[in-house]
A protein has these predicted regions:
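Membrane-embedded, lumen/periplasm-facing catalytic core of multi-pass transferases
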Residues: 376-418
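Perimembrane helix-loop-helix junctions
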Residues: 175-209
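Membrane-interface micro-motifs in multi-pass membrane enzymes
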Residues: 58, 62, 85-88, 106-149, ...
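Hydrophobic, aromatic-rich transmembrane alpha-helices
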Residues: 92-93, 268-303
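Membrane-interface alpha helices of multi-pass inner-membrane proteins
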Residues: 154-170, 175, 181
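Membrane-interface transmembrane helices that cradle and orient dolichyl/undecaprenyl
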Residues: 141-155, 187-194
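Signature aromatic-anchored transmembrane alpha helix within multi-pass, membrane-resident enzymes
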Residues: 156, 353-384
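Membrane-lumen/periplasm interface segments of specific transmembrane helices
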Residues: 201-281
Length: 418
């Protein structure tokens, strides 16, 4: 048996350099961007009632949230919660790196930077009392995909991870789905037979079904044990009713509309000329590499290629907004839209993977993609801190107003402390 120090030395040698780069870069960049809010205590409307809260949100379907948030205690301690949340997010970056098979250190740092700078994380920090639990849910969602990819029967363990991720917060389900789609597409782009491709796809489908079933079974058992029912909040009770009650066409139309509205006019993904240019560079790089590979492999001769392209164009908005199938009338907060950053991350990863076959042209593409990613990281970091500054000023303004209001009340004739 090894001593603690010997075990640490042994473990350090077993950890890949890519994992170390992903973890450290995510943690350091995350701290640099989000340290102001971690060192502050700025409660919002929910935070005032959550100074101490056991996070038993089983009536919202979040049966594992109380455990996930228990590591930092049930008190709202931004510094402790933020550190634990950053640890989970850094581990998620490691899993993303392994899932996407990234090797280039600068690309890994870019992926980590995008993951920890995207404004959806800043929105999560506004609800800091659940932030550590939510980041654990994100980690488990990504881990479910890695298990399914790595091992032939990994879909079983992946299903367990997905179930517990949804048991913390259901909003990260689209994150796992989009990552699955990317991994499957990469597999399809290699030389594999039809049977292998079908079996590979079924693994991910099996993981998703197993995770959803396990999540629902555990939810029903715990609801029965606690004598509770699902709440109407955010339409979560629609899970038991088989949908929202709206027509299918109306729901689908709303999903497409929301996807386009947030992507093009949400002022989050693109909020100025610099972020627009950076996103355009990433998108054009992917289109160029994909078209080039299409001609190299002569995919254009195969009708299946165009079928896949059409399915992606039709399906990606629906998969991104899959949560709206259950509850189309929910208040779609920014913290529920973390999956949008995957489009940027996956475009950067795709460029890194396939821009290495044509000398100087590909080197130029990799330079452009990396610069675009770092422009976005800086841009999102600035946006996050603008949001934090705005939160603080609004809190101080509200606090000052309440002090003046209380002073006037106390000066009213007949007032007495009861």
């Amino acid at each position: 048996m090894k001593t603690p120090w010997e075990f640490l030395q042994y473990s350090r040698n077993k950890i890949k350099n890519t994992w170390k780069i992903a973890f450290v870069s995510a943690f350091v960049i995350g701290l640099l961007i989000h340290l102001p809010v971690m060192l502050s205590d700025i409660p919002n409307h929910d935070g005032l009632s959550s100074m101490y809260f056991d996070q038993n949100m089983i009536t919202s379907g979040r049966w594992f949230l109380t455990v996930a948030c228990g590591f930092s205690s049930y008190f709202t301690i931004p510094w402790v919660i933020g550190l634990i949340g950053m640890l989970w997010l850094s581990l998620a970056s490691v899993v993303l790196t392994e899932t996407m098979e990234l090797e280039d250190p600068l690309t890994i740092i870019g992926v980590s930077g995008l993951l920890v700078s995207f404004p959806a994380l800043a929105s999560t920090f506004a609800y800091v009392f659940t932030m550590d639990g939510y980041m654990m849910a994100l980690f488990l969602a990504v881990l479910s995909v890695l298990f399914t990819k790595k091992y032939k029967k990994g879909w079983i363990l992946g299903g367990v991870c997905l179930a517990f991720s949804m048991g913390i917060y259901q909003a990260y389900l689209p994150f796992a789905i989009l990552l699955c789609v990317y991994v499957i597409l990469l597999f399809f782009m290699e030389e594999h037979g039809v049977k292998e491709k079908v079996q590979y796809t079924l693994r991910y489908l099996g993981m998703g079904i197993a995770g959803a079933v396990l999540y629902y079974v555990i939810l029903q058992i715990l609801l029965k044990l606690q004598g509770k029912v699902l709440d109407t909040y955010q339409g979560i009770n629609s899970m038991e009713q088989g949908g929202s009650g709206q027509g299918l066409l109306t729901t689908l139309k709303g999903m497409y509309y929301d996807f386009l509205a947030f992507t093009l006019h949400g002022d989050v993904l693109v909020n100025n000329i610099f972020s627009f240019a950076a996103c355009a560079v990433l998108l054009l790089s992917v289109v160029f590499l994909l078209v080039r590979r299409m001609f190299q492999r002569k995919w254009w001769k195969n009708p299946a290629f165009f079928v896949i392209i059409i399915l992606l164009a039709v399906g990606l908005p629906l998969l991104t907004n899959v949560i709206l199938i259950i509850s189309p009338n929910l208040t779609y907060h920014l913290l529920m839209r973390y999956q949008w950053v995957l489009y940027l991350i996956l475009m950067l990863g795709f460029t890194d993977r396939y821009a290495g076959e044509n000398g100087k042209a590909d080197i130029g593409i990799r330079w452009a993609a990396l610069l675009a990613a770092w422009i976005l990281v800086f841009n999102y970091g600035v946006s996050d801190n603008i949001g934090y500054s705005n939160l603080e000023k609004k809190y101080e303004k509200t606090y000052a107003y309440c002090v003046r209001l209380l002073d006037r009340i106390e000066q009213t004739p007949g007032y007495y402390q009861g």
